[in-house]
Curated annotation (Swiss-Prot):
InterPro entries: G_TrmE (IPR031168), GTP-bd (IPR006073), GTP-bd_TrmE_N (IPR018948), GTPase_MnmE (IPR004520), MnmE_dom2 (IPR027368), MnmE_helical (IPR025867), P-loop_NTPase (IPR027417), Small_GTP-bd (IPR005225)
Protein name: tRNA modification GTPase MnmE
Cofactor: K(+)
Its EC number(s): 3.6.-.-
Matches recorded under NCBIfam families: mnmE_trmE_thdF, PRK05291.1-3, small_GTP
Protein's organism: Rhizobium etli (strain ATCC 51251 / DSM 11541 / JCM 21823 / NBRC 15573 / CFN 42)
Binding annotation for Mg(2+): 230, 251
TrmE-type G domain ranges (all copies): 216-361
Positions of K(+) binding: 226, 245, 247, 250
Manner of cofactor binding, per the entry note: Binds 1 potassium ion per subunit.
Annotated binding of (6S)-5-formyl-5,6,7,8-tetrahydrofolate, by residue: 22, 79, 119, 437
PROSITE patterns linked: G_TRME (PS51709)
Keyword list, A-Z: Cytoplasm, GTP-binding, Hydrolase, Magnesium, Metal-binding, Nucleotide-binding, Potassium, tRNA processing
Length: 437
């Protein structure tokens, strides 16, 4: 409930050098008076002693106050920066929890209040969640673009064009003889709507790039048994992930590790050797390997140069790099390989990482980071584009029906940013946050 005042640990779990406790809601000023003696100057750090109701000191620290609506949540907000021990936090939380109308925040409740009070839209909220969980440089940059409102500004500008088009058409329908209504607005409106359709279509094509940055570029290691697949996974991961033996068919399941290559999240998969298997367990492993290949962004086709075998039924249309392995066992490799490596000596591994990085980066050539990054963005944009296309192409339909399609297109755009009813999405989105955000 927005009438409650909420509090939570906003920094990392204790013990730590400093912990930040965030408070938001109508009782924030009263809490500061009770705990710190008075309300400090707006947006200024004040060194205070935090005390219990019995005037016993809990800790010394910095107190900051941000009056609403000029705060993160749009409400009165306070931050207490204190020592990050479990005992200090327990004592502080005991005092806060004992105040009527004050309670511990739920997951993402601070951000949800920011959304409810118009401080953030849904895309910005999702960008904030992604920024908190970002592990690579490109994830950070994409999250900053979204949390700063760059993507939302694009969607808002498109929504305004749709609203203007509807207004002009409806004005022409309702007031055909008025001098204030431009005559024959149809040509102007539908020309702009065609441009908008092209803009949205181009934007939608970049959705896969956003998904790759956020969810990872899938690289599958494939090849015949004993081609060195598990050894390569371990070498690139720089740790023992997969069991390596000379026995063919050791790998039965798909193993996966995350790599940071040139700022991109790369999901690397080790798979069972591709061959006709008799063992039921190995057969299932081969099946899973083929499923992984089908979903891959890139396949590393490994060939043992000391005993070259390439699975004959491998889909050659799949984006792939042919890698000759066990370079240390042959004098000169064939020119049939894009790259030759030895996991024993490390020869060629750096070049392979660089090659993967270049291939990933090529997917983003010429793209800005103002791109959709989630499946729900993609779904709403697809529906928006379909409604807009229907409005443009159904030239023989009643003008009011075409205008209704424009309204639907604007509604689908609004669902992305939360400008229209998206109540069913909110619990899912805000549950991704930690308690103190």
């Amino acid at each position: 409930m927005l009438s409650d005042t909420i509090y939570a640990l906003s920094s990392g779990a204790p013990p730590s050098g400093v912990s930040i406790v965030r408070i938001s809601g109508p009782l924030t000023r009263n809490i500061l008076i009770r705990l710190a003696g008075s309300v400090p100057a707006d947006r200024s750090a004040s060194y205070r002693t935090i005390r219990t109701r019995n005037n016993e000191p809990i800790d010394n620290g910095l107190v900051l106050f941000f009056p609403g609506p000029h705060s993160f949540t749009g409400e009165d907000v306070a931050e207490l920066q204190i020592h990050g021990s479990k005992a200090v936090l327990a004592a502080l939380f005991f005092e806060l929890g004992d105040i009527p109308g004050v309670r511990m925040a739920n997951e993402g409740e601070f951000s949800r209040r920011a959304f409810e009070n118009g401080k953030l839209d849904l895309v910005e909220v999702e960008g904030l969640a992604d920024l908190i969980s970002a592990e690579t440089e490109m994830q950070r940059r994409l999250a900053v673009e979204q949390s700063a409102g760059g993507v939302s500004a694009i969607y808002d500008s498109w929504a305004k064009r749709l609203i203007r088009a509807r207004a002009l058409i409806e004005a022409e329908l309702d007031f055909p003889d008025e001098d204030d209504v431009p005559g024959s607005v149809s040509d102007m409106v539908w020309t702009d709507m065609k441009r908008l359709r092209d803009d949205i279509g181009l934007h939608l094509k970049s959705a896969s790039a956003g998904e790759i940055i956020r969810d990872g570029f899938k690289v599958v290691i494939a090849g015949a048994p004993n081609a060195g697949k598990s050894s390569l996974l371990n070498a690139l991961a720089r740790r023992d992930v997969a069991i390596v033996t000379d026995i063919a068919g050791t790998t039965r399941d798909v193993l996966q590790v995350d790599l940071d290559i040139d700022g991109y999240l790369v999901k690397l998969y080790d798979t069972a050797g591709l061959r006709q298997a008799d063992d039921r367990v190995e057969m299932e492993g081969v099946r899973r390997a083929r499923v992984a290949l089908r979903d891959a962004d890139l396949a590393l086709l490994l060939v043992d140069m000391s005993n070259p075998m390439i699975p004959g039924d491998l889909d050659q249309t799949l984006p792939h790099v042919t890698v000759g392995t066990k370079k240390d066992l042959v004098e000169t490799g064939s020119g049939r390989y894009d790259l030759q490596i030895s996991t024993l000596t490390g020869d060629g591994l750096s070049e392979l990482r660089q090659l993967i990085g270049r291939i990933v980066a090529e997917r983003f050539t010429g793209l800005s980071l103002a791109i959709p990054s989630r499946q729900r963005h993609k779904d709403s944009l697809t529906k928006c584009l379909a409604a807009l296309d229907a409005a443009i192409s159904e030239i023989d339909a009643d003008l009011e029906l075409r205008t209704e399609q424009l309204r639907l297109a604007a509604e689908y755009l609004g669902r992305i940013t939360g400008r229209v009813d998206v109540e069913q999405l909110l619990d899912v989105i805000f549950s991704e946050f930690c308690i103190g955000k």
